[in-house]
Design a protein with these regions (language model features):
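Conserved alpha/beta-domain cores
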Residues: 1-135
Length: 135
């Protein structure tokens, strides 16, 4: 899917946000505890980092698509810089894995964050130093 989108939209920029899964829109095949308020709990990047197999699968697919066009990655529901850096470490691990397998992709793919919760807005200056872009 990402492969086809990247091909069709090139040379325009394709920004792909990683999944914003959580209790309010959880895939039934993923085990996750029931939350009193799923809108405030374990969702977005926190959910993805708690389920690395899901995040890694998506990141590898996005990286493969980056070989075909101007693709960038955006992480949702980032709380602070540490959230972003942790997600970037997972991305680097996926990139290293694909590189070792000889797959083509943009190793320098731009990586950004959505600023959609108050803590991200408060830390936006330090977040901006680590991100290639903010949305």
């Amino acid at each position: 899917m990402y492969h086809n989108l990247a091909r069709k939209i090139a040379p325009k920029i394709l920004t792909i946000r990683t999944f914003d899964l959580g209790g309010d829109k959880l895939a039934h095949s993923i085990d996750s505890p029931k939350e009193d308020n799923p809108y405030l709990g374990n969702r977005g990047i926190r959910f993805s980092l708690a389920h690395p197999e899901v995040l890694r699968t998506q990141l590898r697919a996005i990286l493969r698509a980056s070989a075909l066009g101007n693709v960038r990655i955006m992480f949702p529901m980032i709380i602070d810089v540490e959230d972003f850096l942790q997600a970037k470490r997972v991305l680097k691990s996926c990139a290293d894995e694909l590189y070792e397998q000889g797959e083509k992709f943009d190793y320098d793919i731009p990586v950004g964050s959505m600023v959609e919760i108050p803590s991200a807005a408060i830390s936006s200056e330090s977040l901006a130093r680590e991100c290639d872009f903010l949305s």
